[in-house]
From Swiss-Prot:
Subunit field text: Heterotrimer of A, B and C subunits.
Reaction equation(s) it catalyzes: L-glutamyl-tRNA(Gln) + L-glutamine + ATP + H2O = L-glutaminyl-tRNA(Gln) + L-glutamate + ADP + phosphate + H(+); L-aspartyl-tRNA(Asn) + L-glutamine + ATP + H2O = L-asparaginyl-tRNA(Asn) + L-glutamate + ADP + phosphate + 2 H(+)
Entry protein name: Aspartyl/glutamyl-tRNA(Asn/Gln) amidotransferase subunit C
Highest taxon listed in the record's lineage: Bacteria
Protein's GO biological process: glutaminyl-tRNAGln biosynthesis via transamidation; regulation of translational fidelity; translation
Task performed by this protein: Allows the formation of correctly charged Asn-tRNA(Asn) or Gln-tRNA(Gln) through the transamidation of misacylated Asp-tRNA(Asn) or Glu-tRNA(Gln) in organisms which lack either or both of asparaginyl-tRNA or glutaminyl-tRNA synthetases. The reaction takes place in the presence of glutamine and ATP through an activated phospho-Asp-tRNA(Asn) or phospho-Glu-tRNA(Gln).
Matches recorded under InterPro entries: Asp/Glu-ADT_sf_sub_c (IPR036113), GatC (IPR003837)
Organism expressing this protein natively: Chloroherpeton thalassium (strain ATCC 35110 / GB-78)
Gene3D superfamilies registered for this protein in UniProt: Glu-tRNAGln amidotransferase C subunit, N-terminal domain (1.10.20.60)
Lineage, uppermost ranks: Bacteria, Pseudomonadati, Chlorobiota, Chlorobiia, Chlorobiales
Keywords, sorted A to Z: ATP-binding, Ligase, Nucleotide-binding, Protein biosynthesis
Family: Belongs to the GatC family.
Length: 95
C-alpha cells in the first residue's frame, strides 16, 4: 500500500488543512515512509510474545497539570467552516 498526492489532498480536505505543492510532496513521502515501517513490523513473528495490557508496569501515571499558552480564538475561528462572532457554528444534532 502506498499514499499518493491525491490521498494527501483528500485527507487535507477532510481535516480542513491546506498545503503548498512542496508540502504535499513532503507529506506524501513521509506517510509512505511510515507505511513502509509498519509493513516491516507486520513481518515480525509475534507468535511466542505474550500480549500486554500496558507497555510497562506502572499504572495511572499522570502528568502534573500545567497552564500553557493555547491558540488564539481569532486564529481558531479562521479554521472553522462557519462561525458566529467569536464562536464556532455547528449543525444542530439534537432534534
Amino acid at each position: 500500500m502506498s499514499v499518493t498526492k491525491q490521498d494527501v489532498e483528500y485527507i487535507a480536505t477532510l481535516a480542513r488543512l491546506s498545503f503548498s505543492e512542496d508540502e504535499k510532496e513532503k507529506m506524501t513521502k513521509e506517510l509512505n515512509t511510515i507505511l513502509h515501517y509498519v509493513e516491516k513490523l507486520n513481518e515480525l513473528d509475534t507468535e511466542e510474545v505474550e500480549a500486554l495490557n500496558n507497555m510497562n508496569e506502572r499504572h495511572n501515571v499522570l502528568r502534573p497539570d500545567e497552564i500553557v499558552a493555547s491558540i488564539e480564538n481569532s486564529k481558531a475561528i479562521k479554521n472553522a467552516p462557519d462561525s458566529v462572532e467569536r464562536f464556532f457554528k455547528v449543525p444542530k444534532v439534537i432534534g
